[in-house]
Amino acid sequence: VGILGNQDYMDTPFTSTAYTSKLIQDQQARSVSDVLQNDPSVRVARGFGNFQELYVVRGFPVFSDDISYNGLYGLLPRQYVAAEFIERVEVFRGANTFLNGAAPGGGGIGGAINILPKRAPNEPLTRLTLGAENGGQGMIAADIARRFGEEQRFGVRLNAAKRAGETTVEDEDRSLDMFALGLDYQGDNFRISADIGHQYHFIDSPRPSVTPGSVIPSAPDAEDNFAQPWTYSKEKQTFGTFRAEYDFSDAVTGWLAAGMREGEEKNLLASPTYVGGGATSASLFENAREDDIWTGETGLRGRFQTGAVSHQWVTSAAIFDSEERNAYATSAAFAGDLYSPVDVARPPYATGPFASGGSLDDPGLVGHTRTQSLAIADTLGFMDDRLLVTLGVRRQGIEMRTYDYNSGDRASSYKRYENTPVTGVVYRLTDELSVYANYIEGLVKGDIAPAESGGAPVVNAGEALAPYVAEQIEAGIKYDGGFVGGSLAVFSTDRPFSTIENGVFTDGGEQRNRGIELSMFGEPLYGVRLLGGVTLLDAELTSTQDGLNEGNHAIGVPRTQANIGGEWDLPGVPGLTLTSRVLYTSSQYATLNNDLEIPSWTRLDLGARYRMVIDDHDVTIRARLDNATGRDYWASTGGYPGRNYLVLGAPRTLSLSATVDF
């Protein structure tokens, strides 16, 4: 649980879920977004104008930039994270700046996502997987692990995967090359691990998002592709982490962690705007981006007793540094048709102010972000630790500089500090049942006042607002009976945003997300496993500029999200398991005035797997049919704050794979 470390689920004043590598493999998940479709608190969207996976948790975005890797921000590939090297996907629900530090990408208000890499198990592992999809996409993956040395203390795990071919979207081709190496050493009082990974991801003719005009268009056929044939998205990422722990005594442990990432992205896109009657308007947008990121964290964690009161204390310091280089070019608009796409020759670059910025061949520095923080907390235990009270505070600094795309001159700068506290209480009613409550905050960088708004000058132009402080209160109950478990939570999160009042740029806007969240998991009957839940959300704009749209619902936040997945080990056929999953998302508003909305949708996924032994080798055959009914639907609107682009749901997709353990 962030800097609090490994905690019993029942003893924390928060809710979270971990999705394991077994689930990832059994569901043939290709990326983090495939995994998170199991979570009723999460809906998957897309970044603005690109193909970045974006996750909406409790109605607030978590950008893929803000996913942490082994507890450190900013290290994973920025647009798409392959699933083959992942041991666990951990979803934390709720604000979390005290626990994890401020998310550098500006997300994390509604939750956090942490990825844990695979480690070598005690037994040798040599696993090969072959797979294919009905569109023509093929894949091969290898997972090899060994432990060596005295008492098998040194471990090595290698994961490699390759995918290539056309997807179930017409004329859309994807290719992926992924490599990850994990090393670890387990000493008596010393533990160390290191991970390095590389990922290349390319999409040719990727189906773009659609921005609605005055109406929401009917969803095209889910297999249709309205991309231009010259569009593509390409990224190459290299990343690594290092973590060490040392037990100074039975009561005190120290840790040190560090990581880095170097990334390159190139995109040539043309995302259409719907103008009615099937007609669209689009412009070429080409960009090149390079990222250099390093991050680190160190801390101490321990426990002691004062009379009848136990203490679990922690203190830590963290730093994150990112340099972004970027360049872009655009074209004049060209016409198209959403339902009868026509290929258009690649248009020339436009000229004039803001039509381009920087050199696409050599992108210049446009942004430098640095965050640093100090945190301290104590969890006090009363009544033989049946009552736990957590108190803590993090001193968070956020510094950001932006630079002109063409001249390289500094355009703006920002440096602010904020204290962000936490208070949490857990009471164990029984060994199986606990109740909890918390107050915690989320922190994101404040905006810089523009020179003008709506043609009128802004009085405090250039002023940097203090970090936006989102306040959350939550209460709930948890149950873990061994075979089944779950949680019920009620929460309210207030998130400020910028407005202009009497010509002054302020943080006077506010969005309040209130909700009820039910999640469950377990095996209620022998051979029958369930995973799912429901989230009810009211995302209200409680304070807006001049009261416009006040009281309306936020863009892209459904009032109801429900997931239920099940597995059934078929009696009489050892090794055969049938699976199913139903996802429901209610309608979503696509404009702040709530005049436009996309319809609700329900998706059915079906699957089966069969485990057998052939010549002393474990073999598993898997089949999965996503969107089994072949529904055409808009899956999401928006995701990036203030935008309302539409993303078409994926078509019916049949995935087959075979895994052999040698």
Model-flagged regions — what are they?
Residues 1-123, 475:
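Acidic, small-polar-rich N-terminal luminal/periplasmic segments of exported/outer-membrane proteins
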Residues 84-87, 97-179, 185-191, 238, ...:
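Outer-membrane beta-barrel translocator/receptor signature
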Residues 163-167, 180-247, 260-291, 334-363, ...:
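Acidic/polar loop-and-plug regions of large Gram-negative outer-membrane beta-barrel proteins
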Residues 202-215, 321-326, 426-474, 479, ...:
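Surface-exposed extracellular loop regions of Gram-negative outer-membrane beta-barrel proteins
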Residues 240-263, 283-404:
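Face-selective signature of the C-terminal outer-membrane beta-barrel domain
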Residues 243-247, 251-259, 263-271, 436, ...:
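Membrane-embedded beta-barrel scaffold of Gram-negative outer-membrane proteins
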Residues 312-313, 437, 473, 555-662:
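Conserved C-terminal beta-signal and adjacent last beta-strands/turns
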Residues 485, 490-494, 507-592, 659:
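Gram-negative outer-membrane beta-barrel transporters
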